[in-house]
Amino acid sequence: MLVLALESSCDETAAAVVKDGRTVLSSIVASQISVHAEYGGVVPEIASRKHLESVSFVVEQALAEAGVGLDRIDGIAVTQGPGLAGALLVGISVAKGLAFGRSLPLVGVNHIEGHLLAVFLEAPVQFPFIALAVSGGHSHLYRVDGIGRYQTLGQTVDDAAGEAFDKVAKLIGLPYPGGVAIDRLAVSGDPKAIKFPRPLLHDGTFNFSFSGLKTAVLTHVGKHPEAKEAGINDLAASFQAAVCEVLTKKTAAAVAATGIKRLVVAGGVACNSALRRSMAEYAAANGVELSIPSPALCADNAAMIAVPGDYYLGLGVTSGFDLDALPVWPLDKLALRLKEHC
């Protein structure tokens, strides 16, 4: 099956053609980073307008790079949520138009589900597995028993990890996207220079909290303004170390509690070099089978949307033309989709 997938949940306009939910024939991404960098973060209205400007181009390029026309496409998958409502609607509208015009089946896909399954585009992972989804809007731990079968084990109670990276970066004068800037500076810094707190590390749950850590950085900079200049590398490394330690140890606790020794780490923050290293060291020391997609598949893309899209379309699970954006869409609710179909 050839699936044309579209993604427009935040600030990346993307389209991809994927065969049988595993082989990427094309993956085109139009980034808006340079546009939003001026504002220090994503501006929803601007994001929607940029999606409108780019969506036709990325679809055309995806088809051209794959060497196929719309007449060869068997189905269309589109990110339905979670994300920015206006941004989501751009991709959804185009997907509906293509599906209607070509009489193709259409299915709305959960963006986070796409992240968790992106790894299947590079190597198969056996179910069940524990998954850590870390991005600008999410820091969640899941038990994954199959496509469409997810159990939330823990989640952020305030800021997501990616959000914390961006806010701290802005606080210390670094450009957007903050995670990339902090990762780059941290390479030359001492992660033990500043002892920042590790929120909720020993609370007995699998939940996360990064708001207090952000406040701790603000307090430190207020007391030591020189940290934003001469000590900025140490500051970046120390903050990053705190985030990575919490993410790794909470994930390790979930693995230990469930006894499932297969782990997937996904989402934009999974591009972070320190987090990848921390997870790899933990997995190697504890006999855990670790899978982290390549950075291109950790960042927002449409190829990952085709993985669950292909599966649902193959089952005959489709969406009607009343498909609407779901800015909030918990993964746990996806099981209802399969139950209703069966």
Curated annotation (Swiss-Prot):
Its cofactor is Fe(2+). Binds 1 Fe(2+) ion per subunit. GO terms for molecular function: iron ion binding; N(6)-L-threonylcarbamoyladenine synthase activity. InterPro entries: ATPase_NBD (IPR043129), Gcp-like_dom (IPR000905), KAE1/TsaD (IPR017861), TsaD (IPR022450). It catalyses: L-threonylcarbamoyladenylate + adenosine(37) in tRNA = N(6)-L-threonylcarbamoyladenosine(37) in tRNA + AMP + H(+). One of its GO terms (biological process) is tRNA threonylcarbamoyladenosine modification. Its main location: cytoplasm. PANTHER family: TRNA N6-ADENOSINE THREONYLCARBAMOYLTRANSFERASE (PTHR11735), TRNA N6-ADENOSINE THREONYLCARBAMOYLTRANSFERASE, MITOCHONDRIAL (PTHR11735:SF6). This is tRNA N6-adenosine threonylcarbamoyltransferase. It comes from Geobacter sp. (strain M21). The lineage of its organism: Bacteria, Pseudomonadati, Thermodesulfobacteriota, Desulfuromonadia, Geobacterales. The gene is tsaD.
